[in-house]
Amino acid sequence: MSTVPAKGPLTPQQLSLINRYWRAANYLSVGQIYLMKNPLLREPLQPEHIKPRLLGHWGTTPGLNFIYAHLNRIIQQRNANVIYICGPGHGGPGMVANTYLEGTYSEIYPAISEDEAGMERLFRQFSFPGGIPSHAAPETPGSIHEGGELGYALVHAYGAAFDNPDLVVACVVGDGEAETGALATSWHSNKFLNPARDGAVLPILHLNGYKIANPTVLARLSDDDLDNLFRGYGYEPFFVEGSEPADMHQKMAATLDTIFQRIQDIKKNADVHSPERPRWPMIILRSPKGWTGPKTVDGLVVENYWRAHQVPVANCRENDAHRKILEDWMKSYDPSDLFDEKGALKPELRALAPKGEARIGANPHANGGLLRKELHMPDFRQYAVNVTEPGAIEAQSTKILGDFLRDVMKLNETEKNFRIFGPDETASNRLGSVLEATNRVWMAETLDMDDHLAADGRVMEVLSEHLCQGWLEGYLLSGRHGFFSCYEAFIHIIDSMFNQHAKWLQVARELEWRKPISSLNYLLTSHVWRQDHNGFSHQDPGFVDLVANKSADIARVYFPPDANTLLWVGDHCLKTWNRVNVIVAGKQPEPQWLTMAEAEKHCEAGLGIWEWAGTEDGLEPDIVMACAGDVPTMETLAAVDLLRQSLPHLRIRVVNVVDLMVLQSPHQHPHGISDEEFDRMFTTNRPVIFAYHGYPYLIHRLVYKRTNHSNFHVRGFIEQGTTTTPFDMTVLNELDRFHLAMEAVERLPLGESVAKPLIDNFTEKLALHKDYIRQHGEDMPEIRDWKWTWPR
């Protein structure tokens, strides 16, 4: 167990100054939670000085302020490059207070000036209508992590540290957050951090003992158990424990001196080509919850107990005794010793804060758009599949994309600003070509038989979707680019992380000072229609439904039907910013439909009429066969083949959709097509049989305001699955060619004499299919060997 000597490095004057600075941050934090007037307590507190609704979290805040003050000291002392990730983001008052003290806040928000009037506005705006949120939200300078939903602080910290060799990411992990699954696995991120090319992450485990109303698990472990636990993870824990401020300041200062020297030594001694995994230092900080706040309220323990978690003194407007407790509490910080007559922080305290971009709140790594550089991109057309006739050849679309991504990796090797992420699926998802340009990063033990593992790899693989998502978010938020491929069904593991990132982007877009960051790009493959071998557990296309719920300024969903369209979409997504792009594409051999020139035109429009597949010949169609997704596209064309053979005079229009959001009105989504264009594509009164990759209701939801919505008949995944054959997956969900053809026949005014024999024939085919697969274990030859044979 590592501790520092009892005698600390601070002189009496330094100790007094840093304690006063901490008191100032605590004072401002309490003021934000409680006050809307009288910010410097120049008169006795009155009910009208108190906010009518008291919102915020005090318990974690003094510890966060303590850490911030000491990071300021080490930044000044060592000219260190530090950002601060606040895992307990509900301690937002502290993060706002500290950026105000250092001057960053007033530079960004001039109305919150460094005087009494500005302080009043600072207090009033917190958790107040028209003001700012209660957490370390995008509005907070220096934050890349809101910390509302807990679990992602440490993984964001590592993401920010990758490829930032001069950066130290101080990451506070609350002991409540430490109980989450995502955080628990994040400790293993040190096996992927290369000291020769990456920055350092300094985890600070803040053990204040309690969550909202319960003790925390780690806080009830002995120091020996904690030391053994984190040494097992590969860290060297340093303990800073106590409640007496002077003693704690000395301990923290000495500990940070030791740790930053340790980090410097680790990086100095790291071998660029084959660095060994070091034992990175971390801090375990034991301090009271609600430190320096009221010890009791109404005879009940508050400080160092869960009652300090949110608002320790709850009824300050109506209850005179409570208001007196608050006033005494705030006066205990002695504001006249901290702020001058105008309400500005006294100069000797302001001198403790770093200057310029060295300030935590002004560090450009926490406003990654300032550092973002465009990727050097190959010409995606060079990877085109040579399509002479629609459906004449097959290819693995994601394998073609892998070749493209390999060269994106090569072209950006010098910049070192592009990584690929995946939960042990890069090769499985047919992106293995990228390993021709780089390796999988790996700092743990390696064996002679290991393949493509290296300390300097740029493919991040670990069997945790949480880590892949979190690393990528941290990497993007600090100004870089990335690409995340995942099995479609298991991307649901990070549904909530996606939610939080999308919310962050939505707010950040409205802040002029936050510059755009690279988009979060997903490739969802090994998808529902080709998970016949793994079964029902692997069959779920619902992630896109979640994405479609998000702001239209953020969400994009693409269903490229073949390799050439996938190349266009992949290239496009890597060039965008402030978006979440979801690409759904299969990895198995599939028919290739469009030439590259056709693919470009099709993708730029987002959807299009495939005239070569239809029979309308410039006339109004009798029926529209629409599709979105590679397998639905193939089944739609196979259904069209059946209809063309059975009903040669039928006028069929085939519409393929790549960009799902074009289906919405332009009033709902910026990619939406006009009502006039929609009606031109889908008609105003003809039946539309829409074969969709996912759950059918999403298409109905997107088009419900369109003229012809009542004639849309959508087929997709209806939660029927098992281990079976590929074609049987479509049959189980009635998305196959026979069901699509029957739906078309039933919707057309053909008369029973024409319709019934066709339906009987298609029904018989389905019965034959069922018998055949149960006897032979594979699809019928006419299904396996089907090809589109109609000439252009």
From Swiss-Prot:
What CDD domains does this protein map onto?
Answer: TPP_PK
| One function term, GO molecular function aspect | aldehyde-lyase activity
Cite the entry's keywords alphabetically: Lyase, Thiamine pyrophosphate
Q: What is the lineage of its organism?
A: Bacteria, Pseudomonadati, Pseudomonadota, Alphaproteobacteria, Hyphomicrobiales
What are the disulphide bonds in this sequence?
none
GO BP: carbohydrate metabolic process
* UniProt-listed Gene3D superfamilies: 3.40.50.920, 3.40.50.970
> Into which family does the record put it?
Belongs to the XFP family.
Q: EC annotation?
A: 4.1.2.-
Answer whether the UniProt record assigns the keyword Cell membrane to this protein.
no
| PROSITE patterns to which the protein is assigned, alphabetical | PHOSPHOKETOLASE_1, PHOSPHOKETOLASE_2
Which species does the entry assign this protein to?
A: Brucella melitensis biotype 1 (strain ATCC 23456 / CCUG 17765 / NCTC 10094 / 16M)
Is the Lyase keyword given for this protein?
yes
Q: Which InterPro entries match?
A: Phosphoketolase, THDP-binding, Transketo_C/PFOR_II, Xul5P/Fru6P_PKetolase, Xul5P/Fru6P_PKetolase_C, Xul5P/Fru6P_PKetolase_CS, Xul5P/Fru6P_PKetolase_N, Xul5P/Fru6P_PKetolase_ThDP_BS
Q: Which cofactor does it need?
A: thiamine diphosphate
What is the recorded name of this protein? Probable phosphoketolase
